[in-house]
Amino acid sequence: MSDLVITRPDDWHLHLRDGDALATTVPATARLFSRAIVMPNLVPPVTHTAQAEAYRHRILSHVPAGAAFDPLMTLYLTNNTSPEEIVAARQSGIVYGCKLYPAGATTNSDAGVTDVANVFSVLEKMSDMGMPLLIHGEVVQADVDIFDREKRFIDETLTPLTERFPNLKIVLEHITTRDAVEFVNQAGSNVGATITAHHLLYNRNHMLVGGIRPHFYCLPILKRSEHQLALRDAAASGSDRFFLGTDSAPHPKEKKEAACGCAGCFTAPSALELYAEAFDELGALDKLEGFASLHGPTFYGLPINSGKVRLSKQEWTMPASMALGDSSIVPFRAGETIRWKAELL
């Protein structure tokens, strides 16, 4: 198959950053995606509904003329988040989830939750109100190997959490392991997961063999090929428990190409095309529309988009760099061939 038309997709996990960066990040996503769940890990983090509303307005001010893009906002859970804030967020009509970052797990997560028990009253309110909990599922103890942190989180935190709150809607974000796939498959229908394009296409060998590739470095980190294969099987299975979430996470070039570089891959400029590449490799292009356009809205209880996108097997070259405020950014697969081309119909 060299040409297909799918329902316009959504991105259920996206970092847009703030300030001048929005001039680059917002158009990159609004090019093809109708909606996106916007991560709240700014500095300072988006912890209150009023902050989410202000951030949403800043994002909308950078949507290109004629484009239709709806940012779906989230709140950053802290030890001090109150059940009352959850009520306000739900009633706002613009907040669609709350993000649980174990403190120190990833970029700008220092204000995160230090012990999930600290937010049990908040999770109870979220469960009652149907507000999804979005989880970065890694433990943060220094003595736990970085490649084992997702499995340990599932065993030590997520499993007891789902037992305590059996009706809480949970998205285990950017899953990277066979363990996560098995957990989601065995959990109730209130548990789903997002999968990134880079975790479908690559494993840790691609990042480390023959030289360190800093633009492949992300958190959760790329894993062994056996875990990559499990993710590919899950995405191509047609299960509505798995859906598209790019985790596109931009950082300036100097913060990636450094002695201690930041985690995150800026995949937004070619995100849908990269997913098409992965599904094409799997012989599962017929499953792409469900994964990219149908499963996410169904999980969140939102309408399916009415627009369409055409994907054609047409090669093009990703630019070597792009402007990012006063700096520049190296997009994922910079200077390399992208095998599919997408356009909004």
Swiss-Prot record:
The keyword Hydrolase applies. The keyword Zinc applies. It is an enzyme of class 3 (hydrolase). It catalyses: (S)-dihydroorotate + H2O = N-carbamoyl-L-aspartate + H(+). Keywords: Hydrolase, Metal-binding, Pyrimidine biosynthesis, Zinc. The active site is at D247. SUPFAM superfamilies: Metallo-dependent hydrolases (SSF51556). The modification N6-carboxylysine is found at K99. Pathway: Pyrimidine metabolism; UMP biosynthesis via de novo pathway; (S)-dihydroorotate from bicarbonate: step 3/3. GO terms for biological process: 'de novo' pyrimidine nucleobase biosynthetic process; 'de novo' UMP biosynthetic process. Zn(2+) 2 binds at K99, H136, H174. Substrate binds at H15, L16, R17, N41, H136, L219, H251, A263. Binds 2 Zn(2+) ions per subunit. Its EC number is 3.5.2.3. One of its GO terms (molecular function) is dihydroorotase activity. Disulfide bonds: none annotated. Zn(2+) 1 binds at H13, H15, K99, D247. Its cofactor is Zn(2+). GO terms for cellular component: cytosol. Catalyzes the reversible cyclization of carbamoyl aspartate to dihydroorotate. Belongs to the metallo-dependent hydrolases superfamily. DHOase family. Class II DHOase subfamily. Homodimer. This is Dihydroorotase. It comes from Hahella chejuensis (strain KCTC 2396).
